[in-house]
Amino acid sequence: MYSLILRERSGSITGSLWNRISSRNMGGGPRTFPGGLNKWQWKRMHEKKAREKENKLLDQEKQLYEARIRTEIRAKMWGNPDSGEKTAKSKQSHGPMSPKEHIKTLADRFMKAGAEDFWNENDGPVKKSDQGSRSGSDSIDSTSNSPIDVRRLVSATCDSMGKNRVFGSSRRGFSSMSRFKRNESSCDEGDDFDAKKLDTLSPFSPKFAGTKEKVKSSRSVVGVIRNKGLFGRRKFRKNDSSTEEDSDEEGDEGKMIGWMDMRKTGSSASLGNHDIKLTKRVNRNVTDEELYPPLDINTVREDLSKRKSVDNVMEEKQEPHDSIYSAKRFDESCISPLTLKALSASGILKMTRVQDATLSECLDGKDALVKAKTGTGKSMAFLLPAIETVLKAMNSGKGVNKVAPIFALILCPTRELASQIAAEGKALLKFHDGIGVQTLIGGTRFKLDQQRLESEPCQILIATPGRLLDHIENKSGLTSRLMALKLFIVDEADLLLDLGFRRDVEKIIDCLPRQRQSLLFSATIPKEVRRVSQLVLKRDHSYIDTIGLGCVETHDKVRQSCIVAPHESHFHLVPHLLKEHINNTPDYKIIVFCSTGMVTSLMYTLLREMKLNVREIHARKPQLHRTRVSDEFKESNRLILVTSDVSARGMNYPDVTLVIQVGIPSDREQYIHRLGRTGREGKGGEGLLLIAPWERYFLDELKDLPLEPIPAPDLDSIVKHQVDQSMAKIDTSIKEAAYHAWLGYYNSVRETGRDKTTLAELANRFCHSIGLEKPPALFRRTAVKMGLKGISGIPIRK
């Protein structure tokens, strides 16, 4: 009976459990941790806690280190210089300094060599006192050949003076009353004097002890105190207490003697007699000729001739001034034979001036900050040291590494520049086996980058900061490979160390070993970048300026001109200037720089509608398109490239004949880099800056450059009609995007973005020039961020 009941009950329980198990969602569902966190949130939370714990431990170690340094400083300050190292070692108390010890330390500074220049008439007697101590002289003479023990001196003086004077029993190191002037001493009551204050007569410098003259000087001071007292009987000042007997007994002669004695002895409450001037410094009469020597023209010329730039050195070597090459050959330097073979196969035999000036420093393993003009071979100047560093590291490597190390890291600001440097590096490694060059740039799949780094050799890595930081933060194993880094190179250092990239670069530097060589290259190095470069370079780094002090940073063969025209006519002027240059130059190759990517797209569409052979590159285009167009423009002639600033730095487009910059660049350095796309490898070129009248202020930043203003050309009515027809065919969305981008760019420029009302008027004029009847509306959030909310002429989307 009971067995049947139990059997049925167990069957029902088993069925219900089976139903529950079968209804449960298995696999693929969210796994939650305590607090409703998924596994990624749980993982990040513990990683954050680990980082906080590590930072806390580092702070504790830093505090312990600073405490140890403070202890060492105190031990040095308290150590007795006369007793040697034994006394310093035995004195290991770490408490705070007493006021007396602090005063002694300050007084010791005024006894050092050269401190006489800081003395004044209140610091003590100029000459030694003639009044010596009669009594107690025997005891002092007995110790004249040994260091002075001032406490014995004071005790002996007190015994001999106790018959005539009554000394206060309590020791005072300072006075709480303001009865005397600066550098005067104070005592407890009236003419009472604390003899223990003579303890301050003892100098702390070892040079003072053991000399007979100093003993005589201190003997004379004791004699003055015994014969006259410190101040005689002085009259107390306001708010001080005195008796009538003291004031009646005081005479005029006593006043003067007491005052002079006070001036001689100085202040026992502050510095005592340690600042007594033993010898008077005689002021030499300086003539006007010594103060203002006449200028020697020959000396000035000789000094100027010593300041030689690389250009002057090349002239001494009888090289033509306009040549970028030096007389030195690559086979004269310490470069591997296989690399020399690759150079000779490429037809490169001589070094450029930049390579000649930097290669020896870089091959010696020194840090360097290099400034050189655009198109003078900077890439080769740091690729050759990178290859030699890799060869040296591979030959000296001990054992087998668990992971394949990366020995050289090169940072670039743009994807195109990274790809170009990688191509040059692969050409130099043509005959080297087992050495690979890889790139990490945006626009490619993350997993493909990881697979390529793991499967192919990579001793030299060329990367943009953003993508490299993504690999470091995603724990892809790249951090461990970078721990063997030997050489860190930053190309276009002024841009990468600017505020835009600096935070990413600092994070990357934190992941690199400190024992490394660092090289920074750029065509423009402002003072701010020179200061920030200390984050990357060592203190003893070399600064190599191949341009020269006071020399122009642009190429001499590049003709620079500027056209100031109304902003509404810029889209009419650019096609006119292009057609004029095409007619005059059969093998033309032109780059047109625009302020933003969407304005670039608008300009490209306009020129394409006008049947010109044109290509475009900007940040909004996919990476495959950018690479394809860049390679096509390098290999072709009779082509126009419309681009934004992604092509402004480092890109080596050969034989560019004209560079047009529409609108002001972001700064002076950007103008120089844009212009540097022409005139490369010592060839000629032309640069044209097209600005509006309200952008004329930018010319003040270029006043040291040979920029020639030229009048705006007269536009033909046929050209105007063609431009208007082509502009009307462009899609409205492209125009609206160009308007928004133009407004954002000039709002970020300090000079134009300061006055929002004027900026709105200029934006409306730009809007009408591109064929829009009214300006497109902004999102409310965008208008608030730009500070344009409530400005008339800026419509807000509801």
Swiss-Prot record:
It comes from the Eukaryota. ATP binds at A372, K373, T374, G375, T376, G377, K378, S379. Residues 359-543 form the Helicase ATP-binding domain. Pfam families: DEAD, Helicase_C. The gene is RH48. PROSITE patterns: HELICASE_ATP_BIND_1, HELICASE_CTER, Q_MOTIF. Belongs to the DEAD box helicase family. A motif (Q motif) lies at residues 328-356. Its EC number is 3.6.4.13. It is an enzyme of class 3 (hydrolase). This is Probable DEAD-box ATP-dependent RNA helicase 48. Residues 242-252 have a biased composition (Acidic residues). PANTHER family: RNA HELICASE. The Q motif is unique to and characteristic of the DEAD box family of RNA helicases and controls ATP binding and hydrolysis.
